[in-house]
C-alpha cells in the first residue's frame, strides 16, 4: 500500500513509500480502507519529545484522524464489512496517512450520514478534544445536549473562554458550548475571523491583535470566566490566569497551566493538561449532533494524496481556519 512515512523523528520531512497492508493482530483491530485523513499540529514531534509514549517500534505513519470503509472486523464486532466509519487512532499506533489502517473497535464510530469523506476526516480529533474538554474535563453539564432543561439552566449561568477560537478545536468548543446552552461564550481570535467566530455562536470576542486576555479582563473584572479551554499554549495560557474566576477551571491541551501561572496571581483555580481519549462512544454522541445539523466540522482546505507534504506544512505554519484534509482514495 502507499503510505506517508516520517523516516527521521528529528525532522519534519515526510516521504510517500510502499508498506505492507497491515494485518489485524489485536482482538479489537478493524481493517479499514482509508478515504481521507487530517494532520495534527505537532504530531511530527511526538516521537522525539514523548519517547515513553511513542515507542521506536511504531511504524511512523502520521495522520491519526481516519475516515474510511471497513474491510474486516473481529468476530462479534458491531461493525461489519462495508460500514462507513471514522475514528481518532491512538497516537502510539500507526496513523491513517496510508491506503489502509487498523483502528480499534473502541475508537470507531459510524460516519455521520450527512457528511462527505472530507468533512468526516476533519472531525474526530478536533471534536473529541472539544467535547471532552467541556464535558469530561470541564464543568459543563452534558445532559444539556440532549435537551435536559435543568442542565441547560446550569450551563446558562456559566461563562466559557476558548483561545485560538478559529482553529479546528476552537471552532468545535464554540459550537458545542452553544448547543449546551452556555450563557457566555468568549472567543479569542484575530480581526479577520471575528465574523466567523460570531457565526459559530460566540457571544463575546477578544481580538488578540488589539488586546490580550489580561488587558481584556482588566478593563472589567465582571468579564471573568468559569472555564477556559486553551488550545494554543504560550502567552495565551499565561494570560488565561487573569481571566479565570476564583474556583474556576483552566484546561489546556498544550501544556500544564500551573507552570504558566504569572507571578503575583494567587487566585485558586482548578487547572489541568490532558490528552484526548479516542473514544468511539463520544464520537457517537457527536455524530447525533452532526446528523441533527446542530454542529459541523470546519474544513480549511483539501490536499491530494501525492501533495501530502503541503498539508503538514500548512498545519505546522499555523493560522488555519479549521482542518486541512488529505484525500487518500478517489472515493469521496
Residue spans of the language-model regions?
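Glycine-rich beta-strand-centered segment in the early N-terminal region that forms part
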Residues: 20-39, 50-94, 107
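Short, glycine/polar-rich helix-capping loops at beta-to-alpha or helix-loop-helix junctions
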Residues: 96, 189-198, 258-262, 282-283
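Glycine-rich cofactor phosphate-binding loops and adjacent beta1-alpha1 units
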Residues: 149-157, 186, 199-273
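C-terminal hydrophobic helical "lid"/dimerization subdomain
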Residues: 280-332
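Eukaryotic N-terminal low-complexity, Ser/Thr- and Lys/Arg-rich leader segments
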Residues: 1-18, 24, 78, 147-151, ...
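Mid-domain Rossmann-like dinucleotide-binding core that forms the NAD(H)/NADP(H) cofactor-binding site
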Residues: 121-210
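Conserved hydrophobic beta-strands of the Rossmann-like cofactor-binding core
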Residues: 85, 159-162, 228
